């Protein structure tokens, strides 16, 4: 959503982030001038404006402080505040966001009326709407300026788009819906069939609350999803007696929120809410595949679960140590959820990394790079198989989405062969072993060998070992030399060596 920022706000955010991501949240004046390509007067005025904005936003826990002796600037930030709050506040004040939020709730007779409402010039409004429409067209939406100024297009697409827009820009900072409170949505979700969602779970909870609130808002505005709308997949319906009872209770609670709708309309809109909840699935609180996936006749006709089972078995076949029954069920559930999301939402959230920056950047963690490097070829091979042709329309997203699933479902400390490590120390290796395991054990299957042994894959030592000693001890494996008290650079060296060894522990030697 950062593309909604105007040029002035973009420069402010760039300066903020430059200081924030610097060591100790401190940047020198020279770094800021050179890296941001600005003059000294511009730097001073921008910082002054940012500090004023931060106070105006109500985030007094933030401020940029100038250190004259060091010619540097430091971002003072308390533990209960986040830089994302400031960025979101700038987005909410941007003309593009103001236009979108205003048009969600009302239409206008002409551009002049909208211009007056959002305090943007007439020429500015035309420019902003033109740029917004370039993005909205991808979602089957547009801002019409014909007989009146309004947002038009597919109503289901609109609800998804606005739910994420509000989720990202308002987040947990404030609740933007005045007609219903957050805890009222929670109460409604308590009646949701437990096989698809549990209201007491925090996993994706805020996202679901925002979507349900947006869905109810549009229904209350008499903006209904056309009952003739074609979806590429069957809408959710309860298949077991327990789920049918929950579904009925859920419908009754939705009816209380929409008192002017008849039973048929309530049933249809509820079905879409539940289907969307299913599509956002792979919830941590759900440990078993929802019965809907394997009992619905339409899903069976399209070969939905055959696709899920094929992908799951293919992944399992490529692990050195296979999944347990429970782990396999969770993988199948994740694949079913993401595939259902593809068919239901189509291309509505095609650029998810633009919506939530960094969400797909798994390799930011250097200890995960080897895992990503192992999984990417597997996924590339999988998604190009003829058995996966049903997902061909979504191939651009498959690689990154499936990588997230496999990263979550495959524990490399369990499903790869062990890497045997010996840690040598001048005095005692006990502390080093503890630090080593604490830092790496979630990313590699590690086994400590407390002796010199041919089975050892890697030696780590805080003292040098001569070639003569290596020969006499018959040590042919690599040795990583580290400081007595390990530094960050030591961990990086160790990780690089573990990653090289891990390549042999994943797929290639599984059946050797």
For every predicted segment, state its role.
Residues 1-512:
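A cross-family "folded-core" feature that marks the main globular domain of proteins
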């Amino acid at each position: 959503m950062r593309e909604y920022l105007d040029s002035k706000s973009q420069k402010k955010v760039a300066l903020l982030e430059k200081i924030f991501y610097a060591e100790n949240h401190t940047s020198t004046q020279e770094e800021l001038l050179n890296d941001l390509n600005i003059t000294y007067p511009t730097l001073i005025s921008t910082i002054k404006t940012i500090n004023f904005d931060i106070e105006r936003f109500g985030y007094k826990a933030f401020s940029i402080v100038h250190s004259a002796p060091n010619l540097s600037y430091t971002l003072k930030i308390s533990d209960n505040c986040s830089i994302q709050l400031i960025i979101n506040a700038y987005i909410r004040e941007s003309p593009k966001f103001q236009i979108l939020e205003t048009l969600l709730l009302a239409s206008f007779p002409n551009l002049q009326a909208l211009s007056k409402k959002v305090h943007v010039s007439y020429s500015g409004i035309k420019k902003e709407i033109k740029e917004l429409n370039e993005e909205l067209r991808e979602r089957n939406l547009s801002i019409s300026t014909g007989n009146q100024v309004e947002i038009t297009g597919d109503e289901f697409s609109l609800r998804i788009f606005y739910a994420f827009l509000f989720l990202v820009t308002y987040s947990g900072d404030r609740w933007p819906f005045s007609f219903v409170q957050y805890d009222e949505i929670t109460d409604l979700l308590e009646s949701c069939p437990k096989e698809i969602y549990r209201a007491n779970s925090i996993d994706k909870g805020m996202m679901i609350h925002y979507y349900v609130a947006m869905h109810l808002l549009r229904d209350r505005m008499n903006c209904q999803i056309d009952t003739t709308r074609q979806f590429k997949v069957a809408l959710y319906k309860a298949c077991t007696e327990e789920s049918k009872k929950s579904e009925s209770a859920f419908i009754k609670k939705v009816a209380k929120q929409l008192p002017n709708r008849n039973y048929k309309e309530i049933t249809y809109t509820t079905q879409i809410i539940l289907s969307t909840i299913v599509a956002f699935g792979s919830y941590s609180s759900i440990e078993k595949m929802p019965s809907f996936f394997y009992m619905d006749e339409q899903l069976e006709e399209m070969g939905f679960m055959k696709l899920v089972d094929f992908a799951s078995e293919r992944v399992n076949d490529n692990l050195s140590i296979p999944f347990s029954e429970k782990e396999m069920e969770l993988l199948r559930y994740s694949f079913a959820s993401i595939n259902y999301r593809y068919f239901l939402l189509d291309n509505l959230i095609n650029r998810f990394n633009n919506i939530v920056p960094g969400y797909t950047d798994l390799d930011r963690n250097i200890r995960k790079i080897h895992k990503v490097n192992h999984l990417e070829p597997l996924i590339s091979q999988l998604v190009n198989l003829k058995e996966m042709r049903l997902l061909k329309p979504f191939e651009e997203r498959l690689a990154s989405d499936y990588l997230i699933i496999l990263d979550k479902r495959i524990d490399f400390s369990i499903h790869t062969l062990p890497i045997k490590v010996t840690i040598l120390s001048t005095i005692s290796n006990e502390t080093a072993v503890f630090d080593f395991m604490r830092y790496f054990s979630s990313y590699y299957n590690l086994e400590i060998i407390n002796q010199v042994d041919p089975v050892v894959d890697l030696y780590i030592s805080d003292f040098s070992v001569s070639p003569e000693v290596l020969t006499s001890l018959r040590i042919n494996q690599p040795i990583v030399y580290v400081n007595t008290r390990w530094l960050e650079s030591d961990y990086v060296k160790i990780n690089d060596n573990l990653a090289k060894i891990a390549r042999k522990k994943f797929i290639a030697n599984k059946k050797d």
